[in-house]
Amino acid sequence: AANNVVGTLQPIEELAHLTKLHGVLFHSDAVQAAGKIPLDVNRLNVDLLSLSAHKLHGPKGVGALYIRKGVKLSPIVFGGGQERGLRSATENVAGIVGFGAAAEVAREELAGEASRLNQPRERIAESISRTLPHSYVFGHPSQRLPGHLSFGFRGQERAVGKLLHALEI
């Protein structure tokens, strides 16, 4: 649903429509978008959608997979039959409850979250562009995650490359 590097919101509805035309299931990784923008699986028309609790200030190591009714999946690990036979392992009940609580808080706060996150982003972006005239913002100018800011500096590509090499990235 959203790119975690540059923050661009992807056109999920349109992409899902295209896959439906060709009889292909559509999965969206909505981990970055959860709690920041509305995610309505019916409006998005996705077949599968992934979420992660830690992006909602919930416990790490807990996630969710939405599966549209009628979508048939096959397990890749066999065993105890948890998760309706799709995953074998003991469920992390405490983590699941924590995820549920975090999701509830995120849902309650969603309406004001975008403006809360965008105000400092815009101040920072303006300050950077004013102070560092060779800077530029990555990603779409308006279709982007609330609070997300990713920028670069013209003419500094070699310096960045050297830094990444020095950091062994």
Language-model segment annotations:
Residues 1-169:
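Pyridoxal 5′-phosphate
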